[in-house]
Structure formats: C-alpha cells, structure tokens
Amino acid sequence: GYKVKLLGITQIRKKNLINFVYPCLVDHNELISKVDGVFNGIIVESDFCKKSFFQGEGAGSQPTATSVLSDIIDFSIKERKEKSKSKINIVKNTNILDRSGSFYLRFSTVDQPGVISGITNELKKNNISMKSMLQKDGISKEKKCATIVVTTHNCNEKDMMKALKKINNLNFVVKKTTFIRIENFK
C-alpha cells in the first residue's frame, strides 16, 4: 500500500536542478512514509554514501525557535560567507513537466462498453504503460457510473498531462480525473 506525503524533492542531474514540492504517494514500507507529527525526514542519495535517512523535529515551538535563531545567525555572517565562496556552477531549473515517474489515476466514468479501451488508447498514444487497474461501481443517482483506478509505470509527466487532457474530454468521463504522483525510492 501507499501513504500520502507532502514531499520536497531536490536533485541535480546533468547540470539541471530538479526542485519540486507536491503531495504524492509513497510506499508504506519506505522510512519516509513513517515520518509523522512534528517530525521531518530527509533522504540523501549520493555516489559516495548511497542512501542515508535523517529524521528530527521540524515543527513546534523549540524546533521553530532554533530555525529562526539559525536564520538570524546565518544572516548576520552572510557578508563573511560571501567573500569565502568560490564560483558556483549555474544550473538550469527543470520544469515539472520534465519529471519522470509513476502515477495513481482515478477516473469517474459512465459504466458502458468501450470506456476502458478509450482510456487505454489515450494512454498508449502518449507512451504510458499501466502497472495495475481496478474498476468499481461508481456513485450516481442519474446514471450507472464506474470508478476506474490505474497505476502507471514510469512515464514523462508532459505525456501524462497530454493524455489526461484528452481523456477528460471524452464523452463518457463524468468528472475530471484525479491524479497523484507516486515517488519511488528504490
């Protein structure tokens, strides 16, 4: 299963800065999925230390006071730090549409023949492969509806947005598709 988490993700790949914050699904076996309450967690991956996980208090009066005090100290010695810095390599910030990853999709549709093939056809056109699919009866008093849940293999976010735009305009779609990014730490 998965757990919903608000993650900030920063990576540097080929001189591009990847820096996003969004709610996503995380496998419930991952350490980061178990971080709750006043705690924050950080996963650091590098060529040298592989994967490290850090957890500590990040909310509440004492952690907040510590952060504020740290910011004041950093600000007060900023001028001295600026003089000691070497040149920083400039990296290009990446657009979220360039993200690659898995997705959870929930479609609300009329329950009729051809719905699943209509959805999968649009996914196929955009090079998106399904990992799993489940269909349940939907809730509607006017017509027979279905809820279709799909998880995908890794794909390009730009392709996913193009596919969802087309799918949401299909005549059997009852409401806009719900999508949540899935973050894999393997």
Regions found by a protein language model. Give the residues of each.
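Structured core elements
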Residues: 5-6, 20, 43, 53-55, ...
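A broadly conserved detector of short glycine/acidic/proline-rich loop/turn motifs that flank catalytic sites
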Residues: 8-10, 25, 48, 58, ...
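Residue-level signal for pocket-adjacent positions within structured domains
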Residues: 27, 49, 175
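A short, polar/proline- and glycine-enriched secondary-structure boundary/capping micro-motif
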Residues: 32, 63-67
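Substrate-binding/catalytic subdomain of NAD(P)-dependent oxidoreductase enzymes
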Residues: 1-34, 39-41
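Short acidic (Asp/Glu) and glycine-rich catalytic loops that position anionic groups and cofactors
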Residues: 45-52, 99-100
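A conserved regulatory-domain signal marking ACT and ACT-like small-molecule sensing domains
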Residues: 67, 72-186
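Glycine-rich phosphate/pyrophosphate-binding beta-alpha loops
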Residues: 50-52, 56-63
